[in-house]
Amino acid sequence: MRGAYYVAIAFLVAASSRTAAEFDQAEPQPAINNDILTSGGTVNEMLPKRVLRGSRDLKDKLAVYANDEQRTFDLFPNENNFSKALNPTITKTANVMRADRDDVMAKAAEQ
């Protein structure tokens, strides 16, 4: 098992050194046009539409639209109702955590 561990470490080191060797270490320099960056003598156009492009498939279940979101604060007309509804929940959670902590401490003391 120890040999497999050493082999795995060797593969990870080799992969990371290969990645570091392929990486262009020149700092990106801003060009005259804000949409173009130069890196090591090459010109790279920045296309934000391609970087953060969403799925064009209408059947995509992962697409989330702003009008589909449910806001927690919209459920309560004002802050007072929100805090009144939240206080019992916080109190109950704190009591459960306190009781569990006491049980754990009692069990540890018994051992």
From Swiss-Prot:
Which superkingdom?
Eukaryota
Q: Point out the glycosylated residues in this chain.
A: 81
Q: What are the subcellular locations of this protein?
A: Secreted; Host nucleus; Host cytoplasm
Gene Ontology CC entries for this record: extracellular region; host cell cytoplasm; host cell nucleus
According to the UniProt entry, where does the motif RxLR-dEER sit in this chain?
50-71
Primary subcellular site in the record, as a coarse category: secreted
UniProtKB keywords: Glycoprotein, Host cytoplasm, Host nucleus, Secreted, Signal, Virulence
Described function: Secreted effector that completely suppresses the host cell death induced by cell death-inducing proteins.
Q: Domains: what does the record tell us?
A: The RxLR-dEER motif acts to carry the protein into the host cell cytoplasm through binding to cell surface phosphatidylinositol-3-phosphate.
Protein name per the record: Secreted RxLR effector protein 159
Source organism (scientific name): Plasmopara viticola
State the taxonomy lineage. Eukaryota, Sar, Stramenopiles, Oomycota, Peronosporales
